[in-house]
Amino acid sequence: MCGIIGYSGPRPAAEVLLKGLERLEYRGYDSAGIAVVTDKAYIESVKKSGKLNVLKTCLERRTTPIVGSTGIGHTRWATHGEPSDRNAHPHMDTEQSLAIVHNGIIENSDVLKRELLASGKSFTSETDTEVVAHLLSDAFKKTQDLVQAFVEVTQRLEGAFAVVAIHKDQPNTIVAAKNNSPLLLGFGQGENFLASDIAAFAEYTQRVANIDQERIVALSGDSVYITDFAGHPVDYEVHTVSWHPASVDSSGWSSFMLKEIFEEPQAVENTLKGRTEDGTVILPECDHIRDDLLAIDRVVLVGCGTAAYAAMTASYSIEAWAGLPVSVELSHEFRYREPVLNSKTLAVFISQSGETMDSLMAVRYARQAGVKTISVCNVMDSSIPKESHAVIYTKAGPEVAVASTKSFVCQIVVLYLLALYLGQLRGFRSIFPRQKAVCELNRLPVKLKQVLEIYESVRQLAHWMSDSRSILFLGRHAGYPIALEAALKLKELAYIHAEGFAAGELKHGPIALIEPGQPVFVIVPSPVGSPILHAKVISNIREIKSRGARIIAIAAEGDSAVLPHTDSVLRIPLTRYSFEPLLSIVPLQIFALELAADKGFDVDRPRNLAKSVTVE
């Protein structure tokens, strides 16, 4: 991991590569580098650990610029070896005739490395990538063709990978191999691109082709050639995407994350658009599996991190509105515990990027078990949608900040829609309550805008609490996963201890953490929507308040019962009980962002995190 860019064409390659790497920064990284085949037919490579600016400064200080029109670039997120200059990509062979960049993990790299060491090869890094560089170099010496070298080497590699290479003896050519790691082509006028993300080349073209699994690609400025791993030519399809570089511009905002939080009302509106009519839900994406959905008797929701919490949040609504039992699984645990699955199981996979490797592997596992699969993703034409029976896209737009915000709320909205759709198909409950739910669902964009009006109050609260070393979050019912997500956001951004608990679990252990001054956020259900749960949560608040905790409540407008027992109250508009979690998370997202910003941290690119986790 984490970001790849390749370019061949008339432009100065180094400039194109650096711009591409800038667009890939949001994916998270710890080092960066480029390699270019120069006009004098040798490869020049520069790589540095740290931020991209370190690499730029190094290039600016050179007495002679790197001149060449074909090259590759990489931002690295360490998986093998510490973040350092020597472990940064690109990596080269011993003769400095070949350079490669690589995303993924070569699972048998230790075995291959021992073979290479025994043959006299030496290594300058700790990475699995350098192993591939030596293998390709040896294969090229035999074949004198980089595509054929890849055909030979890919037979020996185990794991998920995207490897991209240049060779001084084929100066205008880039060759790449893809196996379960994101890689796509961009087609320009007399120039072509390779990248792990369209953001890397969207400034130049929106004509793209997705590369299938187990493919080798050779490109120059005026040609593209694709084979399978056996070297047999294969066809590909070019299409135009609607994606503008301005969508990843944070001008006028202090951070992408803040911009994206304020985009949530529009993102939810876009996600709902065209999917409801006269109180019913319309999901044409699922029409072709309608009969299968009528036959299901249970639902499994699968995701990682924030996506898993979106699944947990919506699971209550699926059970209530569709009358189906629901379980929520972590993608990386799902296929290793022999889950009981059959043809009457519906598995729904949630992933912002559509490339989360754990979730992709889980999709394949489910399909092999005869399960019908639906994916909920934000990135069009990504791997998980292509391998699912159906996909319902969130329409959040590009999300640049590593910590997910608008995608999270849109994932929940899509799952609400799916819950109502399944209820319609099954004739579960009467039409009237369902129509009321759809009507209130369509009011959420306006109510999200109202929540954003308390931004300044939340910012001041974060400043007041910036010295906190531990913060707890409590919720009940669908407020519980919101507590988990709020704690995750604080850990991701502010690097402090935070935990989310089901409020009813307090007396079973967590109450031991409460001491005078301990900050505790409590997500309070509305007394209108659920008076019983509201009373229970007020009881929980009183328990911890009596032990000296500092209570901050997220509560609906008009709820006066919280006032005597809390230190602060952040108000959300009154809405249907099922939808309260969607509004409750917004001030908690803002709080995490502002607390981290107050500490001086980069809220868009938190340490050690990647936007798209494409390795297991």
From Swiss-Prot:
The annotated active site, in chain numbering, is 2, 611
Going by the record, the broad EC class of this enzyme is: transferase
**Any one GO molecular function term:** glutamine-fructose-6-phosphate transaminase (isomerizing) activity
Q: What is its main location?
A: cytoplasm
Is-annotated flag, keyword Kinase?
no
Which residues does the annotated region (Disordered) include? 70-89
Q: Which UniProt keywords apply?
A: Aminotransferase, Cytoplasm, Glutamine amidotransferase, Repeat, Transferase
Q: Where is the Glutamine amidotransferase type-2 domain?
A: 2-222
Q: Where is the SIS domain?
A: 289-428, 461-606
Cellular localisation: Cytoplasm
Q: Report one GO cellular component.
A: cytosol
Protein task: Catalyzes the first step in hexosamine metabolism, converting fructose-6P into glucosamine-6P using glutamine as a nitrogen source.
Q: What quaternary arrangement does the UniProt entry report?
A: Homodimer.
- Which HAMAP family does the protein's record reference? GlmS (MF_00164)
Q: What is this protein called?
A: Glutamine--fructose-6-phosphate aminotransferase [isomerizing]
**What species is given as this protein's source?**
Tropheryma whipplei (strain Twist)
Q: What are the top taxonomic ranks of the organism? A: Bacteria, Bacillati, Actinomycetota, Actinomycetes, Micrococcales
Gene name of the encoded protein = glmS
